Amino acid sequence: MMKAILIAAATILQAYLLGSVDTGILVSKFVYHDDVRNHGSGAAGMTNMLRTFGKKAAAMTATGDVLKGVLAVCIGRWLFHMLPADAGVSPYLGVYLAAIFAVLGHLYPLYFGFKGGKGVLVAAGAILSIQPVLLPFLAIIFLVCLIPTGMVSLGSVAMAALYPVLTIIYGSLQGYAAGDMLVCAIGSGFMSGMVIYMHRANIQRIREGKEYRFGKHNKK
């Protein structure tokens, strides 16, 4: 029991600390000698980096954010593999603990005054490591929302909202045990909720018709 608690704590800690390494802030400060959080939406994610510093900055940010999600989950999986097979712990607990706290670290980074990004790409990196088969479906959902509207935020919220649904469908098709299904449902639900919560201002602007649209005329 104590070993399981220590492993869970180590998983949470490493994921949060990795998540706190905010690529957007680092790139904006060390490459562009500025802080992206002082511009645009105030977030430190790829979208605001693209709007503020351009495609190269956005690409570097996206790569870093996805990789830290992948790495956090891989470490969490490795740590939980140290538990004996008869420990009665779902193998999905480690990966979802890592995913959730990597996203949390990105949202509230320890090293940067607890003000970071919105977690979409970190979550995508985590999903790439947990259930890569879901990413094409999530990408389609994103594009279906983005292409006609130009709103990245709408695509992000739609992906987040439907991720738990896709997770449950996938788990059912794969014949997950009840305990594993519960962990996956709760874990994906937490990830979804965090991303949607961080987009609450965007959701309000969408309702008011004021949300930023890429490639379209934006009202001032």
Which residues are covered by each model-predicted region?
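Alpha-helical transmembrane segments in multi-pass membrane proteins
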Residues: 7, 11, 15-20, 24, ...
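Helix-coil boundary and interhelical linker segments in multi-pass alpha-helical membrane proteins
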Residues: 1-10, 74-96, 128-135, 169-186
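C-terminal ends of transmembrane helices
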Residues: 24-27, 105-115, 141-150, 200-204
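Short, non-helical or kinked segments that cap or interrupt transmembrane helices
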Residues: 35-43, 111-124, 151-162
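C-terminal membrane-associated helical module and adjoining short loops/tails
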Residues: 176-178, 183-220
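Cytosolic, membrane-interface loops and tails of multi-pass inner-membrane proteins
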Residues: 25-58, 204-220
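Interfacial segments of multi-pass membrane proteins
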Residues: 50-55, 76-80, 101, 119-149, ...
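Loop-to-transmembrane alpha-helix initiation sites
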Residues: 136-138, 152-160, 178-188
